[in-house]
């Protein structure tokens, strides 16, 4: 598929143990990790995190993002420090094709929590645009999360 080809449809589905190896590979991409401003986890830490904090938590809504039957990323909703959060990760091969926009359009109706927060790297302009397009508002404060390498912009959907 040509890098410039826009994606016309995404499918969201539950994430299973069999998906973790590909999700692990996605988060190992150094360019994606730098853009997300989130360091990649080593294999053991990654699997432990996903099994205990994501797949093992009934309060977490995690979905795989598929394009034409191929798992190209994941999106999730969880609570952190009393805030309802949302975040996603998309395989770099699918950047710039509208996957994030379609994914948020499909995922937001599944999340009833409001306000809903997202934290985005200051240099990740594409993700900032996707959030703004979906009604999120950029707040006038920076957030420093535990694993992040620098402060992040905070966005909120009321």
Question: Could you say what each language-model-derived stretch is?
Answer:
Residues 53-59:
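Short loop/turn motifs at secondary-structure junctions and domain boundaries
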Residues 31-51:
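Conserved GNAT-fold acetyl-CoA-binding loop/helix
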Residues 1-30, 35, 62-158:
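Acyl-donor (CoA/ACP) binding surface of acyl/acetyltransferases
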């Amino acid at each position: 598929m040509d890098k410039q080809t826009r994606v016309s449809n995404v499918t969201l589905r539950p994430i299973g143990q069999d998906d973790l190896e590909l999700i692990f590979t996605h988060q190992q991409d150094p360019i994606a990790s730098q853009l997300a401003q989130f360091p990649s986890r080593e294999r053991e830490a990654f699997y432990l995190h996903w099994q205990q904090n994501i797949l093992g938590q009934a309060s977490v809504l995690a979905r795989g993002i598929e394009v034409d039957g191929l798992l190209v990323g994941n999106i999730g909703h969880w609570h952190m420090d009393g805030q309802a959060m949302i975040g996603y990760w998309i395989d770099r091969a699918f950047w710039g094709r509208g996957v994030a926009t379609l994914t948020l359009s499909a995922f937001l109706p599944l999340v009833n929590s409001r306000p809903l927060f997202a934290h985005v790297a200051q240099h990740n302009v594409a993700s900032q645009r996707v959030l703004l397009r979906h009604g999120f508002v950029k707040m006038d404060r920076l957030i420093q999360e535990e694993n992040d390498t620098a402060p992040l912009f905070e966005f909120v959907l009321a």
